[in-house]
Amino acid sequence: LREIAFRTAGGGTGKAVDIDEFDTMENGCRQLIVWNPEDEEIIGGYRYLYGRDWRTDKNGQPVLATGHMFRFSQQFMRDYAPYTVELGRSFVSLDYQNVRGNTKSIFALDNLWDGLGALIVINPDCRYFFGKMTMYPSFSKRGRDMILYFLRKHFNDDDKLIVPMQPLEMVTPEEELA
């Protein structure tokens, strides 16, 4: 379902099944599924992995789907990783996306986020969510820059806990975003 949802938007893996080594490895990713019991349909889902289950490589870096994108500081690994959940591969099934113009879509994201809240209730030692998000090249650069500006202004990582290997540069002048 995730592959179908992303392929429709111009993304996806192109494979028949959207499974990788992080799904199949020992103590691999788990799946959060949001279910509509009335229609017996999957609304959406997230792939997740508890920090306490992360494996590390010979350099002390976590073996994660985001591992090729970021460097994780020793402080992060010591003080935050055990209480963090890596999120990825989120999706909303096509029938529950607002672009379809149907009423099924009204609570799809809310239900998905309620599921994330349930992870915290079930596992009270989890305090943080971490993950990446996809923005396709067709997404407005100005729109992307507005998101980057907001995140850097209000949630900047001054301690360099997690550092991107290839940081995104804003193309929109900052004074236009302030």
Outline where the language-model segments fall.
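Short amphipathic alpha-helix that is part of the acyltransferase structural core
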Residues: 1-50
